[in-house]
Amino acid sequence: MRYDLINLSTVMNPDPKLGGLSFFEGTRDIPFEIKRLYCIFKAEQETHRGFRAHKTSSQLLFCPYGSVQVLLDDGKKKEKILLDEPQKGLIIYPNTWRELTWLKDDSVLCVAVSEYYNPSENTQDYQEFLQYLEENK
């Protein structure tokens, strides 16, 4: 299974009313240059998304608000990762299937991506994913 859990840098303000700040810097804190960033928001609890694998791009997923469960699958083994703290980051490398489940209403999931958008670089069919893995051992 090709992934890394990382801690995003976090600074808490001495005044609790001002909250905290979590951040990362591309190529310093993550192993790729960021070419795209998107956020998924206003999703209801038990929303399921993802259902895909990327052939060439790596991604950093983090949940600045709420709770999202990520199911990772390398074709042989499955593992669940919980993103429920703003300083928790999950780097997913190419050829890893992912499924996302919102565990709380209005959770926000942000994704930093190593490549520009290219729909032909991912598969949304699990059987095609398994076949691609078999052909590219």
Describe each model-derived feature in a short phrase.
Residues M1-K88, D105, A112, N118-Q127, ...:
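Non-catalytic, conserved peripheral segments adjacent to functional cores
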Residues E85-L90, N95-W102:
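Well-ordered alpha/beta subsegment
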